[in-house]
């Protein structure tokens, strides 16, 4: 078996259906699918059963333990030479696995990851969120962009790793947020060959509304400090930008009663985002939504970063995450 596709799932049967359908359309066929349900209240077993005669597919249900441990559970029960880790809210183009195989044949790698895109069927909000998570003007290009301010770290929505490397590293940690970056850091620290496969991209839905998106990025900001406490050298300038942006916006807003021109930098940045997103998505409507998504992405991450910095670096508290009771709902 060449590839095992590991998919952790929590309350997303409809998305699993779309992902499995896209797996049936792959031009490269030497793979199995391992679905691991993380104690969902809305299980996807009935959906999985409809693909038993179309895919080499295996379904498991286990007590809730978060995405990292759920991936480990699936990896232990898989058979592939390479493990492909995907989020359940992804849809694959027909040439996805073929693109991975082509890259590995051209130049072997121990681990790899690919970028993400927005499918034409996604809502305008989803496309705006996709822009905010992939644009150089919001992330510095660190999530697989051609322009980037830091090296590429594979992320769990689209990641691959050799089975023996996965085993040697002990799989994902027990972190509920940032566990994929933790894993990628350990890949590089272990001296393994790891790189971006630019043509192995996926359509990634992410969060479907701005409230859920804020919760996600806020926890990402918290996770960055949790990672810093484990790996101090992992904190780079690009990771400080959302926190700096958040502080800058707060200062400028506080200055508004004294000088209306203090809003100018905020307005110019919003205009830049709107123009860039409108051009990329060919839609002014999405461009306007992208302003909201980008500010939520930066401020959500920034406030999470500052919150964790205060609690962990100043008060000396233990690792934590926010919205623990309802984040997965």
Features from the language model and the residues they span:
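N-proximal low-complexity "stem/linker" segments adjacent to membrane-targeting elements
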Residues: 1-25
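Acidic donor-binding segment of Leloir-type glycosyltransferases
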Residues: 20-65
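Acidic donor-binding/catalytic loop of UDP-sugar-dependent glycosyltransferases
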Residues: 42-43, 90-103, 185
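Glycine-rich, basic loop-to-helix element that forms the pyrophosphate-binding segment
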Residues: 62-78, 99, 149, 153-157
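Short aromatic/hydrophobic "clamp" motif used to bind/position activated sugar donors
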Residues: 83
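Conserved donor NDP-sugar-binding/catalytic core segment of glycosyltransferases
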Residues: 95-127, 200-201, 205
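Catalytic donor/gating beta->alpha subdomain of glycosyltransferases that bind UDP-sugars
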Residues: 173-235
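Membrane-embedded multi-pass helical conduit in multi-pass membrane proteins
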Residues: 245-315
């Amino acid at each position: 078996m060449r590839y095992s596709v590991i998919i952790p799932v929590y309350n997303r049967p409809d998305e699993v259906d779309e992902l499995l359908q896209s797996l049936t359309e792959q031009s490269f066929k030497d793979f199995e699918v391992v679905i691991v349900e993380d104690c969902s209240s809305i299980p996807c077993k009935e959906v999985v059963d409809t693909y038993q005669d179309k895919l080499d597919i295996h379904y498991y249900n286990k007590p809730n333990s978060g995405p990292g441990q759920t991936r480990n559970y699936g990896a232990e029960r898989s058979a592939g030479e390479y493990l492909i880790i995907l989020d359940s809210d992804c849809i694959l183009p027909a040439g996805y696995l073929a693109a991975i195989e082509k890259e590995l044949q051209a130049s072997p790698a121990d681990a790899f990851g690919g970028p993400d895109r927005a499918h034409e069927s996604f809502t305008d909000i989803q496309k705006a969120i996709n822009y905010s998570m992939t644009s150089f003007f919001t992330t510095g290009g660190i999530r697989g962009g051609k322009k980037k301010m830091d090296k590429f770290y594979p992320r769990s929505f689209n990641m691959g790793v050799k089975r023996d490397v996965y085993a040697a590293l002990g799989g994902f940690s027990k972190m509920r947020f940032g566990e994929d970056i933790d894993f990628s850091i350990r890949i590089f620290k272990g001296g393994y060959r790891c790189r971006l496969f630019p043509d192995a991209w996926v359509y990634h839905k992410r969060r479907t509304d701005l409230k859920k998106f804020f919760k996600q990025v806020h926890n990402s900001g918290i996770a960055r400090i949790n990672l810093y406490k484990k790996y101090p050298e992992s904190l780079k300038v690009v990771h400080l930008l959302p926190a700096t942006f958040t502080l800058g916006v707060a200062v400028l807003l506080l200055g508004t009663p004294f000088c209306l021109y203090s809003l100018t930098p905020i307005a110019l940045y919003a205009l830049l985002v709107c123009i860039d997103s409108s051009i990329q998505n060919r839609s002014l409507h999405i461009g306007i939504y992208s302003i909201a998504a980008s500010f939520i992405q930066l401020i959500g991450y920034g406030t999470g970063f500052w919150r964790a910095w205060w609690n962990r670096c100043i008060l000396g508290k233990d690792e934590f995450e926010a919205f623990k009771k309802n984040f997965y709902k």
